[in-house]
């Protein structure tokens, strides 16, 4: 069993995380994070349309909605099933409430510190020290892309995580982000 001190590291202020990590996270999980107020209605519409036509869709949960689930166990998805409509609506309502009380930087900081990564690793401090042997502010672009790739499917096969990380890194390079060093 993993040492519980390693499992959840220290709280890391958002300013103490690398710009590459913040960019990789937003590209991976919520591209319109700074444009919505907790619920990305465009993503909800796209997911609903895809579900209607039985197409594979990307989830519509924003970072704020995911954070609401991390903060309130009643809003977390059951391990064996998908979220029901009522649970999804409750999560959206909680996300909107969070957005009225917290600033975007506070939401992003809390998310990075509470999100589960691979196995029992929770939070960016535990991940950066366990996986990379360094602090969160020292993560470079490839490491940041890998960290963000682990969020979507923390226990996916390594090949799938690596493929996703490579796609994220390419997106970061395509945007010519100045945090790639």
Regions found by a protein language model. Give the residues of each.
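Juxtamembrane regions of bacterial inner-membrane/periplasmic proteins
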Residues: 1-181
